[in-house]
């Protein structure tokens, strides 16, 4: 067998050549893509190696850009340095107070914005483009305001008492931050409570209107007679009788009166700063005093805008106790003088008045209650039967769903509502053995019987009405379920209000504090002498 000569093999056809060429082209493209991917991977690795080899950057605070823009004053590593600025940087980005990144040769190479973290300090005073700030310990420092604060200063949105982020080392303040502490303690609003919403306190309302509203509405007459408006009003008396409601109604009435008065047309509204007294207490020394200063600073700021401001301290005895009576601390020895200085400072303002409310007026420091500070003292006592009817009429009226038989019996919804009010008042104000609550045993051997009528309050009456409404709703739901009629007739009836009175009395009958009967009697408004014991009715 002879070997075949290669030249004797048949030549490839044109089709075979085209297929071979296509295969070679595809292989070439794959090799090209692989080479490109390898180059990109190599470039990425080289970039990472370069980043790892790059020396660490230093950051600093730009103090100022010098005249030519080629150098800048920078505070870095606790040193004030003059450094070169990269020519690649836009000079408009180099704002004083901004944080800058420094290159290997301490050249400014990047602007990273303004610091959003640091120490928190309170603004004591705004001096041009600088601020006097104080920390929690009261240490003051003067810092420059960065660009984010400049517009706030220009628009007078940054004032004394506001909190800012500062860097004490570089001497800059960067941002204003909201302080929840004082905002949560103070409710700044125009209340929606009017005198018409308050029942049984017509005498007290007249007194406080004379003390508060007249000086605001007729300042020229007061000046003509040389009479200074009172700086403050104390509302005191047993709990639950409308002290806070009166204070809110004053602010609401002032807002309406000022808006409609031609002589006071510049007043658009009034402000009611409702200070939650016990929450002012703080374990850190000086914090309570600082918050009081901020509250009055806010009042002054609003008053300077020409708006009447009422600063209302609820539970006043909690923070302004008589000095020297503290058991575990002497906090009142500094808090009381702080309030006294603020009250005396209000003298130069025409639009600020302080209203305090307390159940324990005997615990408040006498210096606060003297004339010239809280001038007017109004006792808000428990309602009698007539006042109770007035209060009840605010809660039960013809707009409520009333039982059809009750309406038919009295000839109309208004008459039926009045009948329910009378039923509650007559039941509560009975003075017989069945309605006796407690017997007070006095130190001199005498005894004094107290009835439920002696403990009626506006809050108690409102609660009785709410209970009665609950009973009526539950009965209506039960009737609707049994009759499968969602519109089943219901409505408030006499049985509901009488059951509500019984439930209220049953819930309250074990509440008297027999461990300290004298204090309980005083808080309840029945301090007739030293009480040595309390006996509950059978």
Curated annotation (Swiss-Prot):
Example GO CC term: the record gives: proteasome complex
InterPro entries in the record, alphabetically? AAA+_ATPase, AAA_ATPase_domain, ATPase_AAA_core, ATPase_AAA_CS, NA-bd_OB-fold, P-loop_NTPase, Prot_ATP_ID_OB_2nd, Prot_ATP_ID_OB_N
UniProt keywords, alphabetically: ATP-binding, Coiled coil, Nucleotide-binding
The answer to keyword Coiled coil applying to this record is yes
Positions bound to ATP: 240-245
Coiled-coil region list: 14-54
Please provide, alphabetically and separated by semicolons, the GO molecular function terms listed in this UniProt record.
Answer: ATP binding; ATP hydrolysis activity
- The keyword ATP-binding is assigned to this record: yes
Name which cysteines form disulfide bonds. Answer: none
The processes (GO biological process) annotated in the record are: modification-dependent protein catabolic process; proteasomal protein catabolic process
Describe its assembly: Homohexamer. Assembles into a hexameric ring structure.
Mind telling me which NCBIfam families this protein's record contains? pup_AAA
Question: Which family is annotated?
Answer: Belongs to the AAA ATPase family.
Q: What is this protein called?
A: AAA ATPase forming ring-shaped complexes
Top-level taxonomy: Bacteria, Bacillati, Actinomycetota, Actinomycetes, Mycobacteriales
